[in-house]
From Swiss-Prot:
Function: Binds to the 23S rRNA.
GO biological process per UniProt: translation
Chain positions recorded as Zn(2+) binding sites: C7, C10, C33, C37
SMART domains: TRASH
Leader sequence residues: none
Record carries keyword Oxidoreductase: no
Cited InterPro entries: L24e/L24_sf, Ribosomal_eL24, Ribosomal_eL24-rel_arc, Ribosomal_eL24-rel_N, Ribosomal_eL24_CS, TRASH_dom
The protein's name: Large ribosomal subunit protein eL24
Gene3D superfamilies: Ribosomal protein L24e
Keywords: Metal-binding, Ribonucleoprotein, Ribosomal protein, RNA-binding, rRNA-binding, Zinc, Zinc-finger
Amino acid sequence: MPDVRRCDFCGRIIEPGTGKMFVKNDGTILWFCSSKCERNMLKLGRDPKKVRWTEKHREFMAEQRGEL
């Protein structure tokens, strides 16, 4: 059974056989579900907690409100 992976930017589940794996020079592996996520993290350098449409932002805001 293939591993279920999550996008390192938005937190969505990546279906097996889809998505993109990016390996940094230090050996860190990043998984992206779409080019939108890849661009936002690598090219634009955005923090997932500050981008409103990501799961990581929703989790961060819930934590700030004390819902978790």
